[in-house]
C-alpha cells in the first residue's frame, strides 16, 4: 500500500497513549482528562485495542504491558507494524513536529518505507502575516518556496485552508483585496482571506506548471475546524478556473461527511481525485460503506487511500487494516451486484497502490 497522506510518527519509544485517538484537541488538563474519560467508550479505541491485542498475542486488558515489552526495541517494533500493514511508501506532510522535514531518512529507516514529502503552504502564510509582510511579499515568498521544494524531492503540495478562512474561495480575489484582508482583526489563522484565496489559485497554477499534485483538506478534522467551511462543494467556482483545471487536485479525508459530493467532483472534474483517509481512524465500522459510496460514482482510477497516521505508529497500522477491511466489504457488495473478479482485483490494486504511484510518479 502507498499511504497517500500521513504525518510523522514518533522516532523514540513513548508509552501507549490513546489520547491521540481523539478529534478534540482542546488544550489544558480539564480537556485532557475529558479525553481520557471518553476514550474507552469510543468504538475506534475499543477496536484498535482488540486488534492490537491480537497482534501482540495478549488479552485486551494487557495491551499496554505487552506493547511496552514489544517496543523495547522501538525500531524493530515500528518496522514490524508497517510491514504487517503492508505499507511500502508514505506521502508525508512533515510540517509538524518542527524539524521533521530534516529527518526523513530516519523515518524511512525506522518504518522500512520510502518517504515522499509534501509541502504544506499555510504555515508560511501564517508566519508572513504575523511578521507584517505585505500580500505581494507573501505571495512571492510562498510561490518561490514551491519552486524550491519541487527541486528538492517534494512530490506534492498541500493546504489546510478549511482550517483557516474556509473553502468558500473567491477565485477572483485581487491583490488589492488581498492587501485589504490583512487589515482584518482576529487570530492570525483566521485573517487574510483575500490573500489566502488569491494564493490558492496562483499556487494551483504553479503546481500545474511543475507537474506536482495539490492536496486540499476537505471535511472532517479536529476540533479547531469549522466543519461547515470544509464542504468540498464550496470549491466549485475555484475548480472552474484555468489554474485549477490544469492542476491535479486531491481532495483528502473522503470529505467526510460529504462522500457523495466528493465522488461527484471526482466524476465530473478531470483533474480532481478523491483520497479516503482520517475517518478510517475515527469511524472504522462504516468505512467500508463510505468507500462503496465513493466507488459507486467516482472512477476507481481517481481514488486513493491513506491512513492519515500520526505520532503513534499503531495509528498507521490500524488505519491501513481498516482500509483493507473496507475494500473487502465494498468488493463483496460490488461482486454481489455482478462486478467481475478480475475487475475487482484491478480496482483493489489501483486504489491501494497504482493510482498513487502514477500520480506522484513514484
Question: What residue ranges belong to the model's regions?
Answer:
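Active-site beta-loop-alpha junctions enriched in small/polar residues
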Residues: 7, 95, 120-126, 160-164, ...
Amino acid at each position: 500500500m502507498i499511504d497517500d497522506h500521513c504525518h510523522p510518527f514518533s522516532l523514540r519509544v513513548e508509552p501507549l497513549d490513546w489520547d491521540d485517538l481523539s478529534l478534540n484537541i482542546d488544550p489544558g488538563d480539564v480537556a485532557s482528562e475529558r479525553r481520557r474519560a471518553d476514550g474507552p467508550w469510543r468504538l475506534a479505541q475499543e477496536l484498535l485495542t482488540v486488534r492490537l491485542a491480537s497482534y501482540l498475542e495478549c488479552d485486551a486488558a494487557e495491551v499496554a504491558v505487552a506493547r511496552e515489552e514489544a517496543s523495547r526495541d522501538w525500531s524493530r517494533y515500528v518496522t514490524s507494524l508497517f510491514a504487517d500493514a503492508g505499507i511500502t511508501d508514505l506521502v508525508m506532510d512533515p510540517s509538524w513536529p518542527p524539524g521533521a522535514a530534516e529527518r526523513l531518512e530516519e523515518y524511512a529507516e525506522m518504518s522500512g518505507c520510502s518517504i515522499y514529502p509534501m509541502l504544506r503552504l499555510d504555515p508560511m502564510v501564517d508566519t508572513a502575516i504575523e511578521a507584517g509582510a505585505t500580500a505581494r511579499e507573501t505571495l512571492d515568498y510562498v510561490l518561490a518556496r514551491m519552486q524550491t521544494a519541487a527541486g528538492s524531492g517534494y512530490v506534492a503540495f498541500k493546504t489546510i485552508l478549511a482550517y483557516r478562512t474556509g473553502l468558500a474561495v473567491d477565485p477572483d480575489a485581487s491583490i488589492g483585496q488581498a492587501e485589504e484582508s490583512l487589515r482584518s482583526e482576529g487570530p492570525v489563522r483566521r485573517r487574510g482571506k483575500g490573500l489566502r484565496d488569491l494564493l490558492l489559485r496562483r499556487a494551483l497554477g504553479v503546481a500545474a506548471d511543475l507537474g506536482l499534485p495539490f492536496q486540499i483538506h476537505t471535511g472532517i478534522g479536529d476540533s479547531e475546524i469549522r466543519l461547515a467551511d470544509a464542504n468540498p462543494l464550496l470549491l466549485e467556482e475555484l475548480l472552474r478556473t484555468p489554474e485549477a483545471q490544469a492542476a491535479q487536485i486531491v481532495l483528502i479525508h473522503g470529505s467526510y461527511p460529504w462522500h457523495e459530493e466528493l465522488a461527484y467532483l471526482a466524476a465530473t472534474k478531470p483533474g480532481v481525485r478523491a483520497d479516503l483517509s482520517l475517518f478510517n481512524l475515527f469511524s472504522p465500522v462504516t468505512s467500508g460503506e463510505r468507500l462503496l459510496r465513493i466507488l459507486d460514482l467516482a472512477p476507481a482510477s481517481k481514488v486513493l487511500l491513506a491512513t492519515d497516521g500520526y505520532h503513534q505508529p499503531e495509528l498507521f497500522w490500524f488505519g491501513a487494516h481498516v482500509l483493507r477491511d473496507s475494500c473487502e466489504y465494498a468488493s463483496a457488495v460490488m461482486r454481489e451486484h455482478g462486478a467481475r473478479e478480475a475487475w475487482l482485483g484491478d480496482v483493489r490494486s489501483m486504489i491501494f497502490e497504482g493510482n498513487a504511484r502514477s500520480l506522484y510518479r513514484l
